[in-house]
Amino acid sequence: MTNKNAYAQSGVDVEAGYEVVERIKKHVARTESAGVMGALGGFGGMFDLSKTGVKEPVLISGTDGVGTKLMLAIKYDKHDTIGQDCVAMCVNDIIAAGAEPLYFLDYVATGKNEPAKLEQVVAGVAEGCVQAGAALIGGETAEMPGMYGEDDYDLAGFAVGVAEKSQIIDGSKVVEGDVLLGLASSGIHSNGYSLVRRVFADYTGEEVLPELEGKKLKEVLLEPTRIYVKAVLPLIKEELVNGIAHITGGGFIENVPRMFADDLAAEIDESKVPVLPIFKALEKYGQIKHEEMFEIFNMGVGLMLAVSPENVERVKELLDEAVYEIGRIVKKENESVIIK
């Protein structure tokens, strides 16, 4: 006779899994769009591409996680924004190629299904999808006892977007003389957290450091990653942007050259970079070399645009936010990024 409790005895709570699905339905519903087909719970998420109205559609996809920022979410028991981070990391990558996000899928793996906690995680994913204009059409929650501790979980996601073939941004339009415009980040975003955790390993998170302008350390460290989709899409539609760089792991040094050809370089005026207080604190308390900061973090600029000089004012007008004119594209001599 089959022991009905055998799976539970191995550490997998099927009923908790069902509860998670029921809890997240209302959050998923917030993200629905015209192209969504079918209901949550099928074997595959479906999306009707014809609803986009794109004449020559090119699908552009991206996948990412949030790295060890998750460890701080677990440490501080705050799980309602980490999902936004996951969405942001994916959709900001595909917007850099000119894609409008269509849909998103998430993957959560945990040592023990805790429905209330996982609902918070997925609620954050849904909020990120709303901000990005993407539908959350599927996902997976895997309970894996023995692989993860009971309080641990991992989170990853996958975004798919669409671009008109003629509006793909691949760096081929970036030329010498283009102006580099920086869009502000919301904070550290989701990269460099192994170093961040080392720097603040002995802190509780409740500290209000003088550099942080009255905010608790844990609030600043868990500030969700900014999603740039709605700000940048109008620029893409008007074909005002030649190149876009999402400043993630590797900071300026690794990411900026990804948006132009090998014979070009980015010359950046450091005095124009809106360095956020958290980066000053990290440099100070971590005793990190100043030049290395630009090799690791976004330093206050989460997205960089290469724009023809004659389009700069129109771009600023459409963005309707603080835009930082931080440099220009030059002919490459030695380095791909020159910070002065």
From Swiss-Prot:
**The keyword Zinc appears for this protein:** no
Task: Give the source's domain of life in one word.
Answer: Bacteria
The metabolic or biological pathway listed in the UniProt record of this protein is: Purine metabolism; IMP biosynthesis via de novo pathway; 5-amino-1-(5-phospho-D-ribosyl)imidazole from N(2)-formyl-N(1)-(5-phospho-D-ribosyl)glycinamide: step 2/2
**Enzyme kind, highest EC tier:** ligase
Keyword Chloroplast belongs to the record? no
CDD domains assigned to the protein according to its UniProt record, in alphabetical order: PurM
Which residues lie in coiled coils?
Answer: none
Q: What is its EC number?
A: 6.3.3.1
One of this protein's GO BP terms?
A: adenine biosynthetic process
* Subcellular compartments: Cytoplasm
* Catalysed reaction equations from the record: 2-formamido-N(1)-(5-O-phospho-beta-D-ribosyl)acetamidine + ATP = 5-amino-1-(5-phospho-beta-D-ribosyl)imidazole + ADP + phosphate + H(+)
Which Gene Ontology cellular-component terms appear in the entry? cytosol
Write the record's keywords in alphabetical order, separated by commas: ATP-binding, Cytoplasm, Ligase, Nucleotide-binding, Purine biosynthesis
Q: Which GO terms describe its molecular function?
A: ATP binding; phosphoribosylamine-glycine ligase activity; phosphoribosylformylglycinamidine cyclo-ligase activity
Q: Which cysteines are joined by disulfide bonds?
A: none
Q: Which family does it belong to?
A: Belongs to the AIR synthase family.
State the name under which the record lists this protein: Phosphoribosylformylglycinamidine cyclo-ligase
Give the species.
Streptococcus pneumoniae (strain P1031)
